[in-house]
Design a protein with these regions (language model features):
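Sequence/fold signature of self-assembling virion shell proteins
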Residues: 121-274
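Extended, solvent-exposed, turn-rich assembly/linker loops in the middle of proteins
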Residues: 52-136, 140, 144, 148
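Residue-identity detector for glycine
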Residues: 4, 28, 41-42, 52, ...
């Protein structure tokens, strides 16, 4: 056990990099998990996205189903969609419930659709009183939102996450864990925490006789080997789950104009039968 032994830890860090790989794998899974909660209001673990436990059914984060919104028109229809109006409508609806939206989080490719919309270009051009060709950027749109009565203080935040996940067949793929068509409305960017507890092996004397162990953040790492024939294993595990601290203050909009599916019950959490 190298807990509290800086010299032993340094030796392990120098000799082996396996612990970095397994640690990053756990952190990557939690990034995937958090992005799913923020963009879908829940998650599903199945054989196509997880090599361990499966839920098969959607597990919500507790966000009220009333907070699930749908754009009036698919944002990809640049001549008829009005993303700025969709954003304003959601901010106003949240305000009526006592929620002050400050951030609208979306993927970069979704913002690319927003800035090409005819209605958006005309609104921004009229606001700055510019007749010639206008270059729409995140900075310009954020300045526009800040100047409007209903969206004062609202800022668009762009994300482009990328993580590697493993399925039940142990095939690894790189994915963007943020649901492509969805955007998230938040009061605070720090909208959740990772709740975690101890792992039984952490305090097992017998376990530590057979393995070198290290606790990094909430991730428990262990390394052990056999001599004949020589084999070595490194494992990282966490007894943890990400949670949205105030799901009532989070809103998610589908910008493809499609209704939420019946199975996406964001209000139903793992405490209700999963």
């Amino acid at each position: 056990d190298c807990e509290g032994d800086s010299d032993l830890k340094s030796i392990l860090d120098l000799a082996f990099k396996d612990q970095d790989f397994v640690y990053n794998a756990v952190r990557g899974r939690f990034e995937w998990w958090c992005m799913q909660l923020m963009s879908k209001g829940g998650f599903v673990l199945n054989s196509s996205n997880n090599n361990g436990i499966v839920t098969e059914e959607f597990v919500g984060c507790g966000m009220p189903n009333e907070n699930k919104k749908v754009a009036a028109v698919d944002w990809s229809k640049s001549t008829t969609a009005d993303g700025l109006q969709d954003i304003e409508d959601t901010v106003v609806a949240a305000s009526a419930e006592g929620v002050t939206i400050k951030y609208v989080v979306m993927r970069k490719d979704r913002f690319a659709l927003l800035k090409k919309q005819k209605a958006v270009i005309e609104k921004v051009r009229g606001w700055i009183n510019q007749k010639e060709k206008l270059t729409i950027s995140k900075k310009v749109i954020n300045e526009y939102l800040a100047a409007q009565e209903n969206t004062e203080g609202v800022q668009i935040v762009l994300v482009s996450p990328s993580v590697r996940i493993e399925n039940a067949a142990h095939q690894r793929t790189t994915v963007n864990p943020w649901e492509a068509a969805n955007i998230c409305f938040l009061e605070d960017l720090q909208c959740g925490d990772v709740q975690h507890g101890p792992i039984a092996a952490e305090h097992s004397v017998e376990y530590k006789k057979k393995a070198s162990t290290l606790k990094k953040d909430f991730v428990f790492i262990s390394k052990w080997s056999e001599l004949e024939p020589f084999k070595e294993w490194t494992k990282a595990e966490a007894n943890a789950i990400p949670v949205i601290n105030d799901p009532d203050a989070m809103y998610i909009m589908k910008t493809d104009g499609q209704a939420w599916t019946e199975g996406e019950d964001t209000e139903k959490t793992d405490e209700e039968g999963y």
